[in-house]
Amino acid sequence: SGATNQELKGTALDRFMLRRLGKTWDGVPVPHLSMNSLDNETFTLFRKYAKLSQRMYEADLQDDNKGLLEKLRLFEGAYLKRAAVMLFHSDPEKFVTGAYIKIGFFREDADLVYQDEVHGNLFQQIRKTMELLTTKYMKAVITYEDIQRIETFPVPREALREALLNACINKDYADTSPIQIRVTDTTLQIVNGGFLPEGWTIDTLLSSHRSMPYNPDIANAFFRAGEIEAWGRGIERIIKACKNEGFSTVDFCYNE
């Protein structure tokens, strides 16, 4: 067997160059992004979450928005990083094509019945998507214990939230396709463009492994907000949440 040469183009070349430089997609600076274009309501929401999580010092949370971003390591020199766009800009799509979530409800014969698009920064997208899925797309079974009303969804809320966070944090946003969520009466499928760490397989994900997020700056902000653990246990938590509520196991697929 002989050596082969492979020509890299487009996003594949970009990923290769970033790896050579020891950079990640979300750590690249954005020259034309100003503090004034970021969303104050999202900063308020983040401070609320981070205070509850106790994963940041109170003094850091009382700093102004620029100081807070510095504590989150969202500056590269004088420039804000792409992670700041995804986390705190009200319209990341001005800078990142396809940075939104698309939801569709399908009949079993694959006919699309209705659909929605969820835009905004990642904190906004996750909140809106969870609300849409649990109020419009998934039908809850209603039961009662004495006078208490209990809603049981086809997918446990904890598992759904963990899967959604995983998809948003680990997406390769150089891929211009949005995250897609396909819902039927019996299934829910989340698809995002992304890559496993080099040498990893689905078996790696299903076994004990360390945390290696594709977008570490984005992941750090969600960790500080108390939204994730950052211990590489997201997949384990999804499976456990499903088992605890008596649901069938989850299927994971990865296609390069």
What are these regions (language model features)?
Residues 1-256:
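Conserved N-terminal catalytic/coupling substructures associated with nucleotide/phosphate chemistry
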